[in-house]
Amino acid sequence: MLLLPIGLFGCGAKKKYAAADVSVISFSCSSMSYTDSYVYSLKKENEEWLFDADYSYDYENPRVEFENKKVSAQDAAAILDVVKEQGLILQAQKYKSPRIKAFVLDGGGYFLYFKMNDGTEINAEIYNEDLVNELRTLAEKCRKS
């Protein structure tokens, strides 16, 4: 008798994903300051990794924007290693939006998004400095190439 109510209320675990299941990862920061806002996106298409970025690399130079830059499997693996080491997929799955949306005029808003190989989308308003640093490193590498 007790098994029936447990099953009805969804006590089943969420599907566990690994970094290898990621087909798209995107991280962005929105800010009142244009130079502090950025968007990075890494996606796998036809067994190739493509990288998009829109950011400022310093306060004196214009924005850098590029789309669909081919990056090596090693560069993609460095990003996915951070995802794995920091447990970012599980963090994003566990994320719950705040009930009260507080609005801070100059507060940065961070957004992490995953699309998995099976089409599942996972997103959360969380920040991870290691991920940002790795994405920024890849963006700079692409900018200079």
Give the location of each predicted region.
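Short, well-ordered, aromatic-rich surface patches in folded extracellular/luminal domains
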Residues: 11-32, 93-145
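Short amphipathic beta-strand/extended segments with alternating polar/hydrophobic composition
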Residues: 39-43, 65-73, 119-130
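Sec-dependent bacterial lipoprotein signal peptides
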Residues: 1-9
